[in-house]
């Protein structure tokens, strides 16, 4: 990943701390392109169907190959490590293995995602396409 300053804030409005950052546009564009390529191909959509793993049974939920997006795994690792260092002062990044699963969820007006639990220590969300209000 290019030596670029990553800006973020950490909030603790209740219980767990929350990291808020802006995903660089290059990654937003790459995630959207990969998602669109898969969703526009019926065979790829079936291969990448991820709906059986998710809380809400939306029409289109697909797994993403985030390793194919140059720099994205490093970006995710960097913000994950920075978050963890801030909320757990005893954290030693050199003793930690980081693994990610990435998927997209297509939602439309009126859809919702019910309360659910993730089986990992950290989870995150990126809003890639937001319709105008």
Predicted features and spans:
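Non-heme Fe(II)/2-oxoglutarate
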Residues: 2-92, 112
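A short coil-to-beta-strand element that immediately follows conserved catalytic motifs
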Residues: 90-102
